[in-house]
């Protein structure tokens, strides 16, 4: 296969609606306000702390930051589906449309890698223990208890992820929180955040 430079690598994403040159970290929260506050804290610290085994389904002893390798349309569809589950089946709140996006090659340089979807015990047999943070359980053997997160196309960064504002884009769910985010930056004299970030994506504009 012919070597591919970055220009041609990016061209592939341009012509494929199912691919993205960016990966997205969605902030969690039981409410929209909590998820928004978590996003603000990440921006103020310029750091995403890794989830641990006790708090975020991470295998092994190494914390990891979780991101999704999916285009915005797919992320928007996943968010809509999760909202439907919460309303119809009283599922636990996972994500509410707040997040932060990075160029994939930036994450790669931070030692971010795609996760490995497999049965946990099987994956532990062929991965060294210091790579167990990459394991995400996949089990389709029981029709009554399917475990499948492959739709998230997850990447993980071991430890924590530090960044500069110029390396990220912000995601908010709607115009209300777009205005609230801008107001926060102005009220707190953090215009530098607004001026340096690569952009702000309003998920509601992706839906319709």
Predicted regions: what is each one?
Residues 1-208:
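NAD-dependent ADP-ribosyltransferases
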